[in-house]
């Protein structure tokens, strides 16, 4: 995730791409919204390309075709008009000052090592601004980490809740805790992937 401050629309490439998308993207998207029927027909024909792009920018480990299609339908179910408004809004977003509201609260920031849209450096900014926050970076995980590794994400959230309850019970100031950054591998998920590869062989 990201608190903003620029560089959110470069698709993991370069600042030049981000600037180009920020300038040209909204206009193109608003125009596409006027020819929705044509775009829908093109999407049907170009589904393999659409799925490949969604897979590339959403996940960093092999996932099922059904999950890729679910993510694609969710993303492209948004109107192009809304996307056109979204691009400049997210480029100008800067919520770093708002993070002070989380001070004194148990916070865990989770993101994927392979997230091309909001890489770990974006999350590190959040962690640096919230004393005592924990940063969990998951190997083999992309931008849609909550769909790619649902059990692991749920586990980390539950652990954060338990830490918060324990800190309150023991009267420990959360903001005095040292910052923790952990890199985690979802072993269960990795084994599933390996078994699937073996079945294909």
Give, region by region, the residue ranges found by the protein language model.
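Catalytic active-site module of serine/aspartate enzymes centered on a nucleophile-bearing elbow/loop
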Residues: 124, 130-201
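Flexible "cap/lid" loop of the alpha/beta hydrolase fold
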Residues: 1-38
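Short alpha-helix in the alpha/beta-hydrolase fold that links the catalytic acid
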Residues: 88, 105, 119-128
